[in-house]
Amino acid sequence: MTAPHLPQIRLYQNWLRDTRGLQFDTYDALWEWSVTDLAAFWQSIWDYFEIESPTPHHAVVTNPTMPGAQWFAGAQVNYARQVFRHVAPASAAGLPAVLSHGEHSLKSGSPARELSWPELQRQVASLALHLRAQGVRPGDRVAAYLPNIPETMVAFLATVSIGGVWSLCAPDMGTSAVLDRFKQIAPTVLIAADSVTYGGRDIDRSDVLAELRAGLPSLRHVIVHSASDEAGATNLIAGGARFTWATSRNDAETAAFDPLWLPFDHPLWIVYSSGTTGLPKPIVHGHGGTLIVALALKVLHNDIGCSYAPNSFGERYHWYSSTGWVMWNAQLSGLLNGTTCCIFDGNPGGTKEQPDWTTLWRFAAQLGVTFFGAGAAFFANCMKAGIDLSGCGDLRNIRALGTTGSPLSEETQRWGTAQFRQVQQHGVEEDGFSPPQQGPRDWLCQTAGAAAPSGGSALHEVKSVGEPIWWCNISGGTDFAGAFIGGNRELPLVPGEMQCRLLGCAVYAWNEAGQPVIGEVGELVCTQPLPSMPLYFWGDTGNVRLISSYFDMYPGVWRHGDWLKVTASGSCIIYGRSDATINRHGLRMGTSELYSAIEALPEVLDSMVVDLEYLGRDSYMPLFVVLRDGLVLDAAMKATLNNAIRTALSPRFVPNDIFQVAEIPRTLSGKKQELPIKKLLLGQPIEKVVNRDAMANPACLDWYVEFAARRAAGQVGA
C-alpha cells in the first residue's frame, strides 16, 4: 500500500482544528495568527511534534524583543535526544538513517553506504563517551574539519549529546580561513579528515591538519578520520585517536548512554557569516530554538515527512551541500523527524576535464530520493548543460524539488518542470507505469477528494500545485538557521516566485519610510523574534556586532539585507541583496532580474553587475560576463546582451560597459561577490573589501584588481 502523502501542513491544520478549535479558511489567516499570537503558535508546534522535556516551561516567550527574546524558559531538550526517539520505530520498519555516496563509489556503480538507526546510535554513544573521557564538558567547543559523510553526522550528534558546542568547516577551506573561524572559539577537540575527494581528485589535507593543530593552542585532543589509511592516521597527530577506533565501542556503557538534558537555550553550534570583509562572525544558535524551527520548516513547509509514518512511508530526503554551507545543517535536520537522509560528497558537476551535471540525478535515481534539494545555481547549470533527466535513471520517486542560495529564475523552473514531464512520460513508455495521484511518486501533488486522516474530514479541497513536480523554493539564512520564505503544497505555484511567508515569520517588505508594502520591492524585515535567531555572537561583548549586523537600520527589527516583493496573492519574490542594488535614474532593481535576462542566453555561463554610484554624478554600471568556450565578446555579442536587457527589463538597465572575464568571484557558499567588487571599483584596497580565504575562486580576483587600477588611471570605464 502506497503512502497517501497528504500535505503535512494540512495534517497540522486538521490537528489545530481538532485539538485547539482553530480553523482557518486561508493560509493568509493561518499565517496572520502565527505571527500575532507567538505564544499560541509556538506552543502548538511544541505540542504537535510532541517535544519532550523532563521539566515544564513556565512561558513560551518572555521579553519578546530582538535581540533578547527568551524561549521556553525552564524546558530542557537535546538535539541528539530528539534524533534518538526514532531509533526503535524506524529500525522496526526496516528503514535506514543515512544513505551516502561519494564520487568514486557512485562512478564505480557500488551500492550506497547504509547507516542504520541502531548503528547511528551506537557510534554516537561510543564517540560521546570518548569525548567525555577526553575532558569535554557542557559548553566546551568541538571543532570539525570534515566532508559530507555519515561520520560528520555522528561526530555532531556525539558532541551535542554531552553538551559540547559544535563548529564545522569544510575540508576544501584553506588553513587561514579555518583558523580565522576556529581561533575565535578556542576549541578543545578537533575532529578532522586528512583527505577529501572533489572533482575526481583525491586531495591530501594532512598538511592543513598539522597547521590547524599548531595554530589552535586551545586543543587538547585530535581525532582523525582517514579515508585511505586509518592505520597511519595516528602518526599524523601525536596523542590523537583514529575516528574508527573512537566509534568502535559496543558494550553495556554504550547501550546505556543517554544524551544530557540541557536548557532550551544551551548553545548547539557555532556557524559563521560569509566573512567577505574582516573576520567571520561566529553565530551561536541554541538546541531548542534550532530544533523547533527545523521541525516546523522541514515538515510543514518543505513537506518532508517521517519515513516510518503511514502518510510519508519511505521518505528519502536529499539536499546537496558541502559542510561549509548551512544547508548541511538543514540536511542533518531530517533525522529530527525520523527521515532517511541521502547525502552525496563531491562535485555535483563532474570534473573539470569531464563536466557531468547528471551526477546528482543518477545518485537520486539509485537511492530512490523523494525530496531533491540543491542550490538554485545547480539547476541553472543543469539547464545550461542541456542534460536530459529521462536518461539519468528512474527519477519517478522524486515528488518535490527544493532550491535556495539565490533566486531561481522562471526559465530554470520551467525547464525543470518540462524535464520531469518527460521523465514521467518516459517511465510510462518504458514499463507502462502510470503515476498515481497520491503515493510515493506523487507527481501531481494532489489531495483533492483524498480520505482525511483520523479526526475529521479535510477542511477544503486541495488544488494541484505544480504538474508534474512541486518546487519548494526557499529563502533564509545561516544567520538564524532557518528560512523566512518557502513552500506550501496547498498554494498556487508560479514559476519565479516563492509560495508564501513561513508560519511564525513576521516578514514584510518595507519601503523607505519603514512601512509595509504589497506589490512593491522593499527591504526584507522580520518584526517578531524567532526561536532560532542567534543567542549571541561568540565573544561579542554587549551584542555590539550582533546589533550592528541586523538591527542598525531599524532598532528592534531584523533587517535581512535582501530586496523582497510580497505579491497581492501572498507569494514572494527575492530580487537579490539590498546592498548590491542597481539604481538607474531613480528606478531601483535587484541584480537577480538582470541575471535572469542575461543568463537565459545560451552564450552566457555566468555574469555579475555592479552599480557604482557617486554624489552628483550618474552611476556607472559595468557588466562582467563568462561566455562559453570559444566565444568572444565582440560588438555583435555586446548588442545581443544589451538587447536582452533592454527587452526583458528596460533601456535604463543597459550597462555602460560589458567585459568578458574568466570567472565571477564567489563565496564558498556560491554567492556572487557583488559588494566587494563594487567597493574595489570605488577605490577601496582589495585587502579591505574581501577575505580571499572566504572565496571559492580567489585567484580570479587578480583580474578585477588590475581592472580597478586601469579604471582608476582613466584607462577604462567612467
What are these language model-derived features?
Residues 289-316, 324-370, 385-386:
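Conserved AMP-binding/adenylation subdomain of ANL enzymes
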Residues 161-245, 368, 375-376:
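Structural core segment of the AMP-binding/adenylate-forming
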Residues 300, 399-401, 408, 413-427, ...:
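Conserved AMP-binding/adenylate-forming
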Residues 29-33, 80, 98-157, 174-179, ...:
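Conserved AMP-binding/adenylate-forming core of the ANL superfamily
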Residues 112-118, 260-262, 268-292:
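Conserved AMP-binding A3 loop
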Residues 221, 608-613, 622-624, 642-718:
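Conserved C-terminal "lid"/linker of ANL adenylate-forming enzymes
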Residues 144, 169-194, 365, 372, ...:
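AMP-binding/adenylate-forming catalytic core of the ANL superfamily
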Residues 189-208, 344-348, 367-415, 427-438, ...:
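Adenylate-forming
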